């Protein structure tokens, strides 16, 4: 297979962690895993090795998560963080439907495409001013006020301001655009329905402050994976025996959990993923 810029023979495994990078599940992608999930079809390799790797990752994700939540029914997280390899419509539908996540922080792998509604959208799925595609509209509110109660995201004219009326002590929207795209005094309003395009609106506005702050947490996951490779010596193995590698991988996970327990007991939480400083 093709991994990180070179061809190699390798055994693949999947790790599920929490937001702290603490391992919660390890799945070895061996024959037993494929036998337990016959819906996973190993297709012929394409002309793009990188694409093959992404397809393999995306196909393994849902079976791993389904198995995990079946084993741990009391664990019910609402936020999913993953890389761009998981940017597929099928995965979004499963995450929000069958599995029950409310937000999915997954970078786009392919540019968004939307139907023509008289306005354009930017790379984050935010509608732009019909007269100026470089001017994104402003998000307003996070809950639906429509009678249908269908979840919506409301965007308003970026040149709209709330003004206070001293006479009747009320606030109203006033559009201060020199070239308005609507006759409404409060400016253009656009409602989008996330369920119609989960890639564009995965429970959170792409590019927002919430998106940027939350996705930073994924750094913990990358650090955890590096600790498995380096501190727990999973990388650069000499043996090619599958059972030995599988056992060593599980022991590495156990070692990390022991590290977490010890760090917690001695109140050194900064070392929950750092074995070497903890024993130094």
Enumerate the language-model features and the residues they cover:
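Basic, amphipathic alpha-helical segments enriched in Lys/Arg and hydrophobic/aromatic residues
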Residues: 213-280
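Short amphipathic alpha-helical "interface-anchor" segments enriched in bulky aromatics
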Residues: 84, 118-154, 194-240
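Short hydrophobic/aromatic-enriched beta-strand-loop microsegments
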Residues: 99-108
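Short gly/pro/ser/thr-enriched loop/turn and capping motifs at secondary-structure boundaries
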Residues: 110-115
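Polybasic low-complexity intrinsically disordered regions
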Residues: 1-84, 88-97
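Active-site proximal loops enriched in glycine and acidic residues that flank catalytic Cys/His/Asp
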Residues: 84, 108-109
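Short, well-ordered secondary-structure micro-motifs
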Residues: 92-93, 116-118
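Long, low-complexity, polar/charged, intrinsically disordered or flexibly structured peripheral segments
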Residues: 153-207
């Amino acid at each position: 297979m093709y991994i990180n810029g070179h061809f190699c023979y390798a055994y693949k495994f999947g790790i599920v962690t929490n937001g702290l990078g603490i391992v919660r599940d390890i799945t070895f992608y061996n024959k037993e895993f494929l036998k337990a999930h016959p819906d996973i079809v190993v297709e012929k390799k394409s002309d793009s090795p990188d694409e093959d790797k992404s397809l393999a990752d995306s196909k393994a994700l849902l079976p791993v998560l389904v198995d995990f939540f079946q084993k741990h029914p009391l664990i019910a997280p609402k936020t999913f963080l993953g890389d761009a390899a998981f940017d597929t419509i099928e995965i979004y539908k499963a995450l929000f439907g069958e599995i029950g996540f409310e937000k999915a922080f997954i970078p786009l792998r392919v540019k968004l495409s939307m139907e023509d509604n008289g306005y354009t959208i930017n790379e984050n799925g935010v509608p732009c001013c019909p007269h100026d595609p470089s001017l994104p509209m402003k998000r307003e509110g996070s809950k639906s006020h429509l009678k249908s109660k269908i979840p919506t995201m409301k965007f308003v004219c970026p040149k709209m301001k709330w003004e206070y009326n001293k006479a009747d002590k009320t606030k109203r929207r006033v559009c201060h655009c020199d070239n308005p795209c609507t006759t409404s005094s409060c400016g253009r309003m656009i409602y989008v329905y996330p369920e119609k395009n989960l890639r564009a609106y995965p429970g959170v506005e792409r590019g927002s402050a919430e998106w940027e702050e939350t996705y930073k947490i994924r750094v913990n996951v990358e650090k955890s994976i590096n600790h498995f490779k380096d501190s727990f010596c999973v990388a650069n193995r000499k043996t090619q025996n599958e059972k030995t590698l599988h056992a060593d991988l599980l022991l590495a996970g156990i070692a990390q959990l022991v590290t977490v327990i010890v760090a917690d007991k001695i109140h050194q939480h900064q070392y929950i993923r750092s074995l070497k400083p903890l024993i130094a």
